[in-house]
Amino acid sequence: MKIQSVVFMVVALLLMGCSNRPPKEYVHDVLLPMTPVKNQGATELCWAYAMLATIETEHILRGDSVNLSPVYIGRMLEHHPSPNKEQPQRAMCQTALNLMARYGMVGYDVLPDDATPELSTPKWVFMLGAKYTPLEFAHSVCAPDEYLSLTCCPDSPYYKKIEVPVPDNWEHNRLLNIPLDTLKAHTDRALLHRHPVCWESRGHAMCIVGMAHDSLQQRYYIMKNSWGTDQPHGGLVYMPADEMWRDVIALYMTKEAYSLE
């Protein structure tokens, strides 16, 4: 959901503005552990990278460790094609959850970022001495309905599920619509209680892994990006809070994180 589009250029300029500013002294209010930053390359699969990064960090914080393959999601998307023929890889983060529930998941080590088309899609997953089908493995790392999909649309009824009217929502997924202040409170509470949150805008998606502030007390959200490590901050983005909330169209967190008081 990034390369080869005007939207990508807008998002790229936005993120350059966020992350290429003169160096600042950031104070981390919270920074969650994470798997290594991946690189989506020329694909438009940022929605898959962001959602899987969220699941990975959630598992690390449970004392588990998984490293999942966005390339597998991209291959399964070919069986579940988008009506967008010009940009067939674009979708929402909810699509990653839907594809996992339907087609399963494999580990990053067997289908990494640089996997060529000649590298076959594995039929089995071997993990800690156990053998799983991709579907069994997916359900072990992300149970169906484990995550809540949230949005804020003032023109629609709150606390009802609504269809977010963006082209990437070609699956017609319905998200829980809540007030912006409530969405902010749930997000900050989740992070402070050590739960990652998946963030999505109209042009990009990333995993929120922390919060920070600078010497002027300006607040930032620390985002795990999917453009490789040859970037400022090793592939992390320090996005000012006002920009993050201005651009958000959807957030995803576990039901456990959402229910925190």
Predicted feature residues:
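Active-site nucleophilic cysteine motif
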Residues: G41-I55, E86-N98, H204
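Papain-like cysteine protease catalytic cores
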Residues: V66-F137
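Bacterial Sec signal peptide processing site at the extreme N-terminus
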Residues: S19-V27
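Structural recognition of the beta-strand scaffold that forms the well-ordered cores
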Residues: L45-A48, V71-R75, A96-L99, G107-D109, ...
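Bacterial N-terminal signal peptides that target proteins for export
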Residues: M1-V7
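C-terminal motif of bacterial Sec signal peptides marking the signal peptidase cleavage site
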Residues: L15-G17
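Cross-family signature of deubiquitinases and ubiquitin-like deconjugating cysteine proteases
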Residues: M9, S19-N20, P33-L61, P70, ...
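Active-site signature of cysteine proteases
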Residues: R21, T35, V125-E261
